[in-house]
Amino acid sequence: MKERKSSKMPNNLPQLQNLIKRDSDSLIHTCFALSQFLQQLRHYQSNLQIFKLNPSHTSKVLQELVMFLCQVAHCYPGHLGSLPQELKDLLHKHHSVMDSDLRMTLCRALILLRNKDLISPTSILELFFELFRCNDKVLRQVLYTHIVTDIKNMNAKHKNNKVNSTLQNFMYTMLKDSNAVAAKKSLDVLIELYKRNVWKDAKTVNVITTACFSPVPKILVAALKFFLGSDEGSAGDDSDSESDVSYLKFEFLEMIMNSLASLLLPKHKKKHKQTSVNFSALHLINDPQGFSERLFKQLEASTGRFEVRIMLMNLISRLIGVHQLFVFNFYPFLQRYLQPHQREVTKLLMFFSQASHDLVPPEVVEPGVRTIVNNFVTERNSHEVMAVGLNAVREVCQRCPLVMTDTLLQDLAQYKTSKDKSVMMASQSLIQLFRSVNPNLLHKKDRGQPTESREDSKPLDYAAVEAKDYIPGAELINYANSTIILLYATLIPDGWETDEGCDDGSDEDGWIDVQHSSDEEQEDEDPSGENQEGEEDGQTRAARISQMRILTDEDFKKIRMKQLTKEVQPKLGKKRKRATTTEEPQGSRNELVALENIEGIYKKRKHDKASRLETVIAGRQDRPKYGTKKKAKMNEHAGTSNKEKRRKKNFMMMRHNKLVRGKTKRSFRDKQIALRDSLLKRKKSKI
């Protein structure tokens, strides 16, 4: 009975908390709970004054009272209106000298008040960013998780632009904070919110660009990894090497729940199908030219680790290739690293290829190509080095074809007869590239069979643009097979002649009757249309169709397929018919260069024991048993001949035979004569 009475005493805070939260209509019950609450509130205020006298002293009673008041704060908003501000002031003034347990309790209390929507998000989040300066790894991880989750929940239904703008401006100042840990965690928050599509805008990206010029290597590497696309797992990598195992478990469970929901709920599946376009962060930078120039200036003065300089080179080359920038000093800077013995030389070749584009002057890139050829494509190097050099030259010429000269190209094309397959294939790929880009640079025997697309395309000069007033390939579509041609009568030029025999009613309506698309098959079979199409010029017909017809997606698909046919099939006569392909054409070239395109050389790998056994077993199939290749006997029961017996007889038994003892060897004179005769015979054969 004493235990039951003691459970209702005011010192039992969980019981009092349950009593206050419980919904009861009893007036006596409500008055008792209020009196007990006011008593605990006065107790909290007295303990708070004691704590302010000695902030470094730990107080378990104060921790319990703070959590109790935060749990029931929504029940008595009038009495606890100043509680959030008091807790924020305590953390703001004494967080550096405060006990770690008490500091964690106060932070959890503020998180609880924020979840109850009793405190504004801006003030508490700014305080939490300042608390990143604390030397407490567990606290930083809790604050990081809450900040990301809270901002994500605020923007779940609609974008809260006012709060987002305030927080982004505050994070911009936090990235310049003198405390490296606080700046690193602030950067991790920005990157995580961008990855979760919460703050995926240009302002966030341009705030992250400021971290690329940080003197702290960890902040610099995190920002570079973000722009290079390898920022997974960098959110928890601070000065104390924090691990985010709980977060990974949460992500794994969320992935499982989403997969189950997509199977059970059709609405959930439709929701996930509506995804926005994922633009790269490099396209959202406001001033890519100035950003790349500042990065290159930092790279020239950098004395840090080689891995960090490699990442800077990669980012600069991507910016130049994506935005087609002009950073002319970057090419001679890379040129000094283009040596076969250089560390990470394949990546450096990839950076040089990425930085090449059509708008850069050829005389700027040509020295680098010459350096690659002189240092890599030589007989003194191994076959792998030569193949890598040829692949790098091909990637550069694919983006800037004008850097190649006919003399250099014809010299590189001679490696197509190399005995090494990797060098031979790399040379053939270079020849194949210039067959489509500029076949005039190749030797006549290397140009291959001319195709229709090669006749239409011509090499352009530097900075020349081929502007067309028609859709290339539109002449391949039958003009009569119109699906959507609705021309209003007022849009018809006055110079056009109309048919006198047409119905007057059609002119009054203002629309032109168009043949239905269901008649396409019948018109395709009409050979007269094909003869008329052949007599008309291709460009004139393409311009007329582009102006008079609204092309659909199926029409563009047919154009791409027929253009691919023109690239593959040779140029034939007009009356020669050819079969159309059904394959889809490849897309346009990527803005970035894949490392596999340079390292992709043919190399015969060594077989392990399992693969060798498979080869041996496969070779034994449909093959007679192993054994001697002697001729089969005419009679299986017959014995051996005397000649075979003498050959197989033991030498010790034959050593006393007169044939063995009487055997004479050639004298020295006989050997001289034989040597002279052989030399004379060899000399005559050469003549």
Curated annotation (Swiss-Prot):
<protein>
    <recommendedName>
        <fullName>Protein SDA1 homolog</fullName>
    </recommendedName>
</protein>
<feature type="compositionally biased region" description="Basic and acidic residues">
    <location>
        <begin position="667"/>
        <end position="680"/>
    </location>
</feature>
<dbReference type="InterPro" id="IPR007949">
    <property type="entry name" value="SDA1_MD"/>
</dbReference>
<dbReference type="InterPro" id="IPR027312">
    <property type="entry name" value="Sda1"/>
</dbReference>
<dbReference type="Pfam" id="PF21638">
    <property type="entry name" value="SDA1_C"/>
</dbReference>
<dbReference type="GO" id="GO:0015031">
    <property type="term" value="P:protein transport"/>
</dbReference>
<feature type="compositionally biased region" description="Acidic residues">
    <location>
        <begin position="520"/>
        <end position="537"/>
    </location>
</feature>
<dbReference type="GO" id="GO:0005730">
    <property type="term" value="C:nucleolus"/>
</dbReference>
<comment type="function">
    <text>Required for 60S pre-ribosomal subunits export to the cytoplasm.</text>
</comment>
<dbReference type="GO" id="GO:0042273">
    <property type="term" value="P:ribosomal large subunit biogenesis"/>
</dbReference>
<feature type="region of interest" description="Disordered">
    <location>
        <begin position="561"/>
        <end position="587"/>
    </location>
</feature>
<keyword id="KW-0539">Nucleus</keyword>
<comment type="similarity">
    <text>Belongs to the SDA1 family.</text>
</comment>
<dbReference type="Pfam" id="PF05285">
    <property type="entry name" value="SDA1_dom"/>
</dbReference>
<keyword id="KW-0690">Ribosome biogenesis</keyword>
<feature type="region of interest" description="Disordered">
    <location>
        <begin position="517"/>
        <end position="549"/>
    </location>
</feature>
<keyword id="KW-0813">Transport</keyword>
<dbReference type="GO" id="GO:0000055">
    <property type="term" value="P:ribosomal large subunit export from nucleus"/>
</dbReference>
<dbReference type="Pfam" id="PF08158">
    <property type="entry name" value="SDA1_HEAT"/>
</dbReference>
<dbReference type="InterPro" id="IPR048292">
    <property type="entry name" value="SDA1_C"/>
</dbReference>
<feature type="region of interest" description="Disordered">
    <location>
        <begin position="615"/>
        <end position="687"/>
    </location>
</feature>
<feature type="compositionally biased region" description="Basic residues">
    <location>
        <begin position="644"/>
        <end position="666"/>
    </location>
</feature>
<keyword id="KW-0653">Protein transport</keyword>
<dbReference type="InterPro" id="IPR012977">
    <property type="entry name" value="SDA1_N"/>
</dbReference>
<dbReference type="InterPro" id="IPR016024">
    <property type="entry name" value="ARM-type_fold"/>
</dbReference>
